[in-house]
Design a protein with these regions (language model features):
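Conserved N-terminal phosphate-binding loop of PLP-dependent enzymes in the Aspartate aminotransferase
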Residues: 1-182
């Protein structure tokens, strides 16, 4: 059985080593997306050598080639290298220190404000990945995304109620989101 982590969404939001580091589990294969390319369009599949081999043992000349217009695009490769190099710098390491505490505190503050205002919405989160949950069913819940858009906020994933924060979201930026949401 091969354990595959899909980190297209989670990427490096939880830890410098991704979800594998955060959960203390080593996957056999991992996928990454635009985070690794600094926002540029990229998809990466990596894993154990035996799973990533491009040929068959019984037919070594039968090489698998993947062709595409943007494969190994120089801008994307440079952005990926810059991202990976920066992961090793002290400012980035410092950004990850205390990350859970920071986002736990912010989620608690957000939920308190929602509760104080009597709104039927709560936030569940994993670090800076937030999901908006309704505390009671209503045929009007879908309208929240349009209200938020009118106030300059967009839920990701076509209305599934996901808020994705940048790791360097300042306290002032967070307060602005909270004020607009509530």
């Amino acid at each position: 059985i091969v354990l595959i982590f899909d980190e297209i969404l989670v990427g490096f939001r939880l830890a410098r080593g991704g979800a594998q580091e955060f959960f203390g589990v080593r996957a056999d294969m991992v996928t990454y997306g635009k985070t690794l390319g600094g926002g540029l369009p990229v998809g990466v599949v990596c894993g154990r050598a035996d799973l990533m081999r491009r040929y068959r043992e019984d037919r070594p000349a039968d090489i698998c080639l993947a062709r595409g217009t943007f494969n190994a695009h120089p801008y994307v490769m440079a952005a990926m290298k810059a991202f990976l190099d920066r992961l090793e710098t002290q400012p980035i390491k410092a950004l990850y220190r205390g990350l859970d505490h920071c986002w736990d505190e912010r989620a608690d503050r957000f939920n308190r404000r929602l509760h104080e205002r009597g709104l039927p919405v709560r936030i569940a989160h994993l670090s800076s990945i937030w999901t908006v949950l309704y505390s009671r069913p209503s045929r009007y819940n879908w309208m929240l995304q349009f209200y938020l858009r009118a106030h300059g906020l967009a839920l990701s994933h076509r209305g599934t109620g996901r808020l994705l924060f940048s790791l360097d979201c300042s306290d002032a930026d967070f307060e602005a989101v909270l004020d607009r949401f509530v």
